[in-house]
Protein backbone atom coordinates (compact mmCIF):
# COMPACT_ATOMS: atom_id res chain seq x y z
CA UNK A 1 0.00 0.00 0.00
CA UNK A 2 1.50 3.33 -1.12
CA UNK A 3 0.41 5.31 1.94
CA UNK A 4 2.53 3.09 4.22
CA UNK A 5 5.66 3.93 2.22
CA UNK A 6 5.20 7.70 2.47
CA UNK A 7 6.54 9.97 5.19
CA UNK A 8 3.42 11.93 6.09
CA UNK A 9 3.59 15.00 8.30
CA UNK A 10 1.02 17.63 9.22
CA UNK A 11 2.35 20.97 10.41
CA UNK A 12 -0.75 22.47 12.02
CA UNK A 13 -3.16 20.89 14.47
CA UNK A 14 -4.86 22.85 17.23
CA UNK A 15 -6.01 19.69 19.01
CA UNK A 16 -4.35 20.49 22.35
CA UNK A 17 -6.52 23.61 22.62
CA UNK A 18 -9.68 21.65 23.31
CA UNK A 19 -8.77 19.57 26.34
CA UNK A 20 -9.64 16.25 24.71
CA UNK A 21 -7.70 13.07 25.36
CA UNK A 22 -5.36 12.92 22.36
CA UNK A 23 -4.93 9.16 22.83
CA UNK A 24 -8.61 8.32 22.27
CA UNK A 25 -10.52 8.27 19.01
CA UNK A 26 -12.96 11.09 18.56
CA UNK A 27 -15.58 11.62 15.88
CA UNK A 28 -14.85 15.36 15.74
CA UNK A 29 -11.85 17.64 15.92
CA UNK A 30 -8.64 17.81 14.00
CA UNK A 31 -6.51 14.86 15.10
CA UNK A 32 -6.14 12.14 17.70
CA UNK A 33 -3.55 9.38 17.92
CA UNK A 34 -5.72 6.51 16.63
CA UNK A 35 -6.65 8.46 13.48
CA UNK A 36 -3.06 9.64 12.97
CA UNK A 37 -1.83 6.05 13.09
CA UNK A 38 -4.57 4.82 10.76
CA UNK A 39 -3.71 7.59 8.32
CA UNK A 40 -0.05 6.64 8.34
CA UNK A 41 1.12 9.94 9.83
CA UNK A 42 4.75 10.03 10.92
CA UNK A 43 4.89 13.58 12.28
CA UNK A 44 2.29 15.88 13.78
CA UNK A 45 3.00 19.50 14.69
CA UNK A 46 0.79 20.50 17.60
CA UNK A 47 0.55 24.26 17.32
CA UNK A 48 -0.58 26.17 20.37
CA UNK A 49 -3.38 28.67 19.88
CA UNK A 50 -2.96 31.41 22.45
CA UNK A 51 -5.12 34.22 21.09
CA UNK A 52 -7.89 34.59 18.53
CA UNK A 53 -9.23 38.13 18.10
CA UNK A 54 -13.01 38.40 17.96
CA UNK A 55 -14.06 39.04 14.39
CA UNK A 56 -10.90 37.36 13.10
CA UNK A 57 -10.62 37.65 9.33
CA UNK A 58 -8.06 37.65 6.53
CA UNK A 59 -8.10 41.42 5.93
CA UNK A 60 -7.29 43.22 9.18
CA UNK A 61 -7.30 42.23 12.86
CA UNK A 62 -6.61 44.43 15.86
CA UNK A 63 -4.15 43.08 18.43
CA UNK A 64 -6.21 44.66 21.20
CA UNK A 65 -9.53 43.12 20.06
CA UNK A 66 -11.43 41.02 22.57
CA UNK A 67 -10.02 37.49 22.65
CA UNK A 68 -12.03 34.35 21.91
CA UNK A 69 -9.54 32.07 23.69
CA UNK A 70 -10.17 33.80 27.02
CA UNK A 71 -13.79 32.67 26.81
CA UNK A 72 -12.67 29.12 26.00
CA UNK A 73 -10.21 29.19 28.92
CA UNK A 74 -13.01 30.18 31.28
CA UNK A 75 -15.43 27.59 29.88
CA UNK A 76 -12.83 24.81 30.14
CA UNK A 77 -11.71 25.99 33.60
CA UNK A 78 -8.09 26.47 32.68
CA UNK A 79 -5.72 27.56 35.48
CA UNK A 80 -6.13 31.24 36.34
CA UNK A 81 -2.66 32.09 34.96
CA UNK A 82 -3.89 31.14 31.49
CA UNK A 83 -6.71 33.69 31.58
CA UNK A 84 -4.39 36.57 30.77
CA UNK A 85 -0.99 35.04 29.95
CA UNK A 86 -0.50 33.84 26.38
CA UNK A 87 2.70 32.13 27.49
CA UNK A 88 0.76 30.18 30.14
CA UNK A 89 -1.74 29.14 27.47
CA UNK A 90 1.05 27.79 25.27
CA UNK A 91 2.53 25.87 28.20
CA UNK A 92 -0.87 24.42 29.14
CA UNK A 93 -1.40 23.10 25.62
CA UNK A 94 2.17 21.77 25.49
CA UNK A 95 1.56 19.93 28.76
CA UNK A 96 -1.44 18.21 27.21
CA UNK A 97 0.74 16.88 24.39
CA UNK A 98 3.57 15.95 26.76
CA UNK A 99 1.14 14.08 29.02
CA UNK A 100 -0.23 12.12 26.06
CA UNK A 101 3.30 11.24 24.91
CA UNK A 102 4.22 10.07 28.42
CA UNK A 103 1.16 7.81 28.48
CA UNK A 104 1.62 6.15 25.09
CA UNK A 105 4.63 4.49 23.45
CA UNK A 106 2.99 5.31 20.11
CA UNK A 107 3.43 9.07 20.55
CA UNK A 108 6.89 10.53 21.07
CA UNK A 109 8.00 14.13 21.41
CA UNK A 110 10.60 15.18 18.85
CA UNK A 111 13.13 17.52 20.47
CA UNK A 112 16.24 16.73 18.42
CA UNK A 113 17.70 15.20 15.30
CA UNK A 114 18.40 12.08 17.38
CA UNK A 115 14.72 11.85 18.37
CA UNK A 116 13.71 12.18 14.72
CA UNK A 117 16.20 9.51 13.62
CA UNK A 118 14.90 7.17 16.31
CA UNK A 119 11.31 7.76 15.21
CA UNK A 120 12.14 7.06 11.57
CA UNK A 121 14.09 3.92 12.51
CA UNK A 122 11.18 2.58 14.58
CA UNK A 123 8.77 3.28 11.75
CA UNK A 124 11.10 1.53 9.28
CA UNK A 125 11.00 -1.49 11.61
CA UNK A 126 7.21 -1.52 11.30
CA UNK A 127 6.25 0.18 14.57
CA UNK A 128 3.12 2.34 14.57
CA UNK A 129 4.50 5.48 16.16
CA UNK A 130 3.90 9.19 15.59
CA UNK A 131 6.36 11.97 16.35
CA UNK A 132 4.90 15.03 18.06
CA UNK A 133 6.37 18.46 17.42
CA UNK A 134 5.40 21.54 19.45
CA UNK A 135 5.03 24.98 17.92
CA UNK A 136 3.40 28.33 18.58
CA UNK A 137 0.97 30.14 16.32
CA UNK A 138 2.63 33.52 16.65
CA UNK A 139 5.33 34.97 18.89
CA UNK A 140 2.68 36.68 21.00
CA UNK A 141 3.01 33.50 23.11
CA UNK A 142 6.21 35.09 24.43
CA UNK A 143 4.12 37.61 26.40
CA UNK A 144 6.64 40.24 25.27
CA UNK A 145 9.54 38.52 27.09
CA UNK A 146 12.46 37.21 25.03
CA UNK A 147 13.47 34.92 27.93
CA UNK A 148 10.30 32.95 27.24
CA UNK A 149 11.95 31.62 24.07
CA UNK A 150 14.29 29.59 26.28
CA UNK A 151 11.40 28.47 28.47
CA UNK A 152 9.39 27.31 25.46
CA UNK A 153 12.43 25.49 24.08
CA UNK A 154 13.01 23.76 27.42
CA UNK A 155 9.38 22.62 27.37
CA UNK A 156 9.89 21.00 23.96
CA UNK A 157 8.85 23.69 21.48
CA UNK A 158 10.85 23.58 18.27
CA UNK A 159 8.89 25.97 16.04
CA UNK A 160 7.60 29.48 16.64
CA UNK A 161 5.49 31.34 14.15
CA UNK A 162 6.33 35.03 14.03
CA UNK A 163 2.82 36.45 13.70
CA UNK A 164 -0.59 34.87 13.41
CA UNK A 165 -3.57 36.99 12.33
CA UNK A 166 -2.58 40.12 14.28
CA UNK A 167 0.46 42.27 15.04
CA UNK A 168 2.65 41.58 18.06
CA UNK A 169 5.89 42.96 19.51
CA UNK A 170 7.95 41.01 16.97
CA UNK A 171 6.27 42.63 13.99
CA UNK A 172 3.28 43.18 11.79
CA UNK A 173 1.08 40.35 10.62
CA UNK A 174 -0.15 40.04 7.04
CA UNK A 175 -3.62 40.14 8.61
CA UNK A 176 -2.82 42.82 11.22
CA UNK A 177 -3.29 46.56 11.29
CA UNK A 178 0.25 47.85 10.75
CA UNK A 179 1.16 45.77 7.67
CA UNK A 180 4.74 46.36 8.89
CA UNK A 181 7.70 44.02 8.91
CA UNK A 182 9.77 42.84 11.83
CA UNK A 183 10.54 45.15 14.75
CA UNK A 184 13.78 45.50 16.71
CA UNK A 185 12.24 43.35 19.46
Language-model segments: which ranges?
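Alpha-helix-loop-beta-strand connector modules within alpha/beta enzyme cores
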Residues: 179-185
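N-terminal hydrophobic targeting/anchoring segments and the immediately downstream early-domain regions
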Residues: 1-179
Amino acid sequence: MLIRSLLIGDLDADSALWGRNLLKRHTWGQVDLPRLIEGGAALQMFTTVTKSPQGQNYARNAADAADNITLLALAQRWPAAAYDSLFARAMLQADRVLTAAAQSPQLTLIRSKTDLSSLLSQRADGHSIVGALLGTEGSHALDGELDNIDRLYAAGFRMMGLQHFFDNRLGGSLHGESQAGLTRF
